[in-house]
Amino acid sequence: MNTICIPLHPDGGKYKDNSELRYALRSIERNFVGEFEIAIVAKKLPDWIQGVRHIHGDGLKSSLRSAAKELPDGFFWWYDDNCLLLPTDAETMKRTPVAGGWSKPVTDWRKQLEKVRARLVEEGLPALDYSSPHGPYWFDLSMIEEAFAD
């Protein structure tokens, strides 16, 4: 079974009521091909949600680590503003699209990504930008441990 992990912002997301999460869950229910479970990574679950796994999380990085420890064999990291618009299976979703190029680093987030890009180039690794598609992403524990190793 595939697990889809959705980290929640403690303040209820963009609209402060987790409404985006409702749309994301509905799209998964309608369009994910195959068996799945939903895991919400948050301090507290919304009062209205039922039938999901709760993984305690506090902050994005620690939530990702918590999910990886609880689901070491792998999971989809999904955001509450992601929607699955067409029937899609797990193998298709594991192929994360890459942006065609790197955008100009104007925001703090993009400036951090520029540091990542520069390090990849310095180490002779492919400098691919996976940040623009904004998920979903497939992770397992070994990937997370490697990413946070240095």
Region annotations inferred by a language model:
Residues 1-56:
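N-terminal anchoring/stem segment of glycosyltransferases
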Residues 85-117:
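Conserved donor-nucleotide/metal-binding helix-loop-beta segment in metal-dependent transferases, i.e.
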